Amino acid sequence: MKTAIAERIEDKLYQNRYLVDAGRPHITVRPHRSPSLNLLALTRVCPAKCYELNETGQVEVTADGCMECGTCRVLCEANGDVEWSYPRGGFGVLFKFG
């Protein structure tokens, strides 16, 4: 009889490694007076929690830990809120399990 082991997604994500390209983030947020609804949504839907509101009400991105899933591209790139490009070769997420 097999024993089921409950694994949390956070435990699996912890196994991934990230090589940060210091000074060259692959994601930038366009300067804004007040964040669009899509930017505000990113603070909740980004699976890596890269987006957050700062103390002045602006949405900021921390690309360290980005899983390059494309959620921000789908949600915000068309209206210009976010600029996204692939990290340079050798940088970005290194998936341990697939």
Swiss-Prot record:
An example of a GO molecular function for this protein is: iron-sulfur cluster binding
Q: Name one GO biological process term.
A: nitrogen fixation
Q: Which InterPro entries match?
A: 4Fe4S_Fe-S-bd, 4Fe4S_Fe_S_CS, ETF-QO/FixX_C, Fd_FixX
Q: Which Pfam families match?
A: Fer4_ETF_QO
List the SUPFAM superfamilies.
Answer: 4Fe-4S ferredoxins
Statement: the UniProt record of this protein carries the keyword Cell cycle: no
Keyword field: Electron transport, Iron, Iron-sulfur, Metal-binding, Nitrogen fixation, Plasmid, Transport
Q: Where is the 4Fe-4S ferredoxin-type domain?
A: 57-87
Source domain of life:
Bacteria
Q: Does the keyword Transport apply?
A: yes
* Function field: Could be a 3Fe-4S cluster-containing protein.
Of which family is this protein a member?
To ferredoxins from P.putida and C.tartarivorum, ferredoxin I from A.vinelandii, ferredoxin II from D.desulfuricans.
What PANTHER family does the annotation carry? FERREDOXIN-LIKE, FERREDOXIN-LIKE PROTEIN YDIT
Report the protein name in the record: Ferredoxin-like protein
Organism of origin is Rhizobium meliloti (strain 1021)
User: What is this protein's gene name?
Assistant: fixX
